[in-house]
Amino acid sequence: MHLSLLKAKIHRATVTHAELNYEGSIAIDGLLLEATGIREFEQVHIWDVTNGARFSTYAIRAEDGSGIMSLNGGAARHVQVGDLIIVAAFASMSEDEAKTFKPNLVYVNARNAISHTNHSIPTQAA
């Protein structure tokens, strides 16, 4: 059996552009792609923290260090510039692989620069 586990996420990034007439995708600062291990053209899920929208698209690389988080094409209709989003990618793996796998979690500041990284999410308390 294969499991689908969170591979990587960019947590609470700020949307910098929403380009309706650009070919569909999300352009992500290249440094964030490298930090997460998300590859160009990989499917990603977008969860808009501001408005609750949830959808999927694919990642393309934006200029390194630019802070760009640009939703393009039809995806641009689901967000507004300034919205906070989570970008997540998943990977399929065996149960044995899943036992030792750790996701790449990247947390960013208001300018979409990396503030810190982690490989686990703290336990949620009551």
From Swiss-Prot:
Enzyme class, UniProt record, top EC level: lyase
Co-factor: note: Binds 1 pyruvoyl group covalently per subunit.
Residues that coordinate or bind substrate: T57, G73, G74, A75
Protein name: Aspartate 1-decarboxylase
Organism: Xanthomonas oryzae pv. oryzae (strain KACC10331 / KXO85)
Catalytic-site annotation from UniProt: S25, Y58
Cofactor(s) of this protein: pyruvate
Family annotation (Pfam families): Asp_decarbox (PF02261)
SUPFAM superfamilies in alphabetical order: ADC-like (SSF50692)
EC numbers on record: 4.1.1.11
Pathway given in the UniProt record: Cofactor biosynthesis; (R)-pantothenate biosynthesis; beta-alanine from L-aspartate: step 1/1
Catalysed transformations (reactions): L-aspartate + H(+) = beta-alanine + CO2
InterPro entries per UniProt: Asp_de-COase-like_dom_sf (IPR009010), Asp_decarbox (IPR003190)
Membrane-crossing residue ranges in chain numbering: none
